[in-house]
Amino acid sequence: MNDYVQALLMILLTVVLYYFAKRLQQKYPNPFLNPALIASLGIIFVLLIFGISYNGYMKGGSWINHILNATVVCLAYPLYKNREKIKDNVSIIFASVLTGVMLNFMLVFLTLKAFGYSKDVIVTLLPRSITAAVGIEVSHELGGTDTMTVLFIITTGLIGSILGSMLLRFGRFESSIAKGLTYGNASHAFGTAKALEMDIESGAFSSIGMILTAVISSVLIPVLIILFY
């Protein structure tokens, strides 16, 4: 099959499956009917049925990645619209994100250390709550397995976006700041997309949470590894 035709088919497959997954969730509101999860499972099923390799899919998937990278710029709009509220809560935002990052590190590091896992495994898992573009680089530079890091980043994002709404209701969080920072800090881009579905203010704070988590983590992870290894 011509490469251009295959690329176009893979793009169409992705868009169509995501569209129907989104419609399914709208018709049957359920956090487990997450469009990203359903579409991903659908793509995997189609690739297995037709014997299409990952590289074959990425002939079209890489174009989608380029488009998604450009759409990140759109996150500037909710930030700009809520700039005054952001300015008024700078200390709360920073303290909340830093606390979230440290708790994540403690959970991952101490658990893996207790079970005797090696430095490579720890480095691979530590960036799981960072957005992929940064997390992959952090893992790669410190000797982790970046392909596995991607898997854990995606899994973390999906779990956060699926269970986040239930946990927020359970904790009775009503503030857009709290909801947004929780999503951005715990489940990066997946969480930010979910926060934007709630309201633009939550989306703005989720964007900040995602960015700050990536920056703080990329600084602290190397420090943690140097201290203990």
Swiss-Prot record:
Q: Which InterPro entries match?
A: CidB/LrgB (IPR007300)
User: Where, by residue number, does the polypeptide cross the bilayer?
Assistant: 4-21, 30-52, 62-80, 89-111, 147-169, 204-226
Q: Which GO terms describe its cellular component?
A: plasma membrane
Q: Name one GO biological process term.
A: killing of cells of another organism
Please list the disulfide bridges.
Answer: none
User: Per the database entry, which stretches of residues form a coiled coil?
Assistant: none
Q: Where in the cell is it found?
A: Cell membrane
Q: Tell me the Pfam families matching this sequence.
A: LrgB
| Signal sequence range | none
Q: Does this entry carry the keyword Cytoplasm?
A: no
What membrane topology does the annotation report for this chain? Multi-pass membrane protein
Q: List keywords of the entry alphabetically.
A: Cell membrane, Cytolysis, Membrane, Transmembrane, Transmembrane helix
Tagged with keyword Signal: no
Q: Which family does it belong to?
A: Belongs to the CidB/LrgB family. CidB subfamily.
Described by its record, this protein's role is as follows: Increases the activity of extracellular murein hydrolases possibly by mediating their export via hole formation. Inhibited by the antiholin-like proteins LrgAB. In an unstressed cell, the LrgAB products probably inhibit the function of the CidAB proteins. When a cell is stressed by the addition of antibiotics or by other factors in the environment, the CidAB proteins possibly oligomerize within the bacterial cell membrane, creating lesions that disrupt the proton motive force, which in turn results in loss of cell viability.
What protein name applies here? Holin-like protein CidB
The organism of origin for this protein:
Staphylococcus aureus (strain MRSA252)
